[in-house]
């Protein structure tokens, strides 16, 4: 299964790179699928197939990878607009609402996505769900001095919340902004992502949460059909 998932991720990353045009300012996402996209971009720049590209990264991980591939970078504050942002997601529901933040980068990811003229999400088919938060926890970035208070208020919404602990250091995960992350699980999942995003962000001490609502223009889905990896494009319907 792992090999099939890798094939799906590679296929969708390659499809995303095909959307990149000369002269673009790009939002470069975080996570395993976005990393494959960044590698593909680096290869096309090195070969001369693409030129005059500038990237804006969403994490320290992406910044290091892009620098290794000699992709020119600018900070978010240094650009007036982003032509195209490409990023992964942890879950995508039928309304194109997302949960992101498995890598604790969702604050910068949301800033970049909001600045972009087009926001394209790249996922493998395992990330498509009927309802958010039934499988993947919702990350909430909080000020270190407020995490207990925020935890209580998240649990008052109906569910549980736990401080995310680091895997290879003692203590909690610390974000690129120096904050902590609470992972929330709501009873029955998230029925109204739009309302919940605002409700959580109104809690004092919360910097941002991992719900990305009404921001995605296209979802590229890597999937296996008859043993072969392919890509399906889901376009948002205009209301």
Swiss-Prot record:
GO terms for cellular component: cytosol. The active site is at residue 109. Keywords: Isomerase. Its EC number is 5.3.1.6. The keyword Ribosomal protein does not apply. Pfam families: Rib_5-P_isom_A. It is an enzyme of class 5 (isomerase). The keyword Isomerase applies. CDD domains: RPI_A. One of its GO terms (biological process) is pentose-phosphate shunt, non-oxidative branch. Gene3D superfamilies: 3.30.70.260, 3.40.50.1360. One of its GO terms (molecular function) is ribose-5-phosphate isomerase activity. Substrate binds at residues 30-33, 87-90, 100-103, 127. Disulfide bonds: none annotated. PANTHER family: RIBOSE-5-PHOSPHATE ISOMERASE (PTHR11934:SF0). Catalyzes the reversible conversion of ribose-5-phosphate to ribulose 5-phosphate. This is Ribose-5-phosphate isomerase A. It comes from Synechococcus sp. (strain CC9605).
């Amino acid at each position: 299964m792992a090999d099939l998932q890798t094939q799906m991720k590679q296929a969708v990353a390659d499809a995303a790179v095909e959307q990149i045009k000369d002269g673009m300012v790009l939002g470069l996402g975080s996570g395993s699928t976005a990393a494959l996209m960044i590698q593909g971009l680096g290869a096309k720049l090195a070969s001369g197939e693409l030129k005059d590209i500038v990237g804006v990264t969403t994490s320290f991980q992406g910044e290091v990878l892009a620098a290794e591939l000699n992709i020119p970078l600018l900070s978010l504050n240094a650009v007036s607009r982003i032509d195209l942002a490409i990023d992964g997601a942890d879950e995508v529901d039928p309304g194109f609402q997302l949960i992101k933040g498995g890598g604790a980068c969702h604050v910068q990811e949301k800033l970049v996505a909001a600045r972009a003229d087009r926001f394209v999400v790249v996922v493998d088919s395992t990330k498509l769900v009927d309802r958010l938060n039934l499988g993947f926890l919702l990350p909430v970035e909080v000020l270190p001095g407020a995490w207990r208070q925020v935890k209580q208020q998240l649990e008052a919404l109906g569910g549980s919340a736990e401080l995310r602990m680091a895997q290879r250091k003692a203590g909690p995960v610390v974000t690129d902004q120096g904050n902590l992350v609470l992972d929330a699980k709501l009873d029955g999942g998230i029925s109204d992502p739009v309302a919940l995003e605002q409700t959580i962000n109104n809690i004092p001490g919360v910097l941002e949460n991992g719900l990305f609502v009404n921001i995605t223009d296209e979802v590229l889905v890597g999937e296996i059909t008859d043993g072969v990896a392919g890509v399906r494009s889901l376009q948002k319907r205009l209301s």
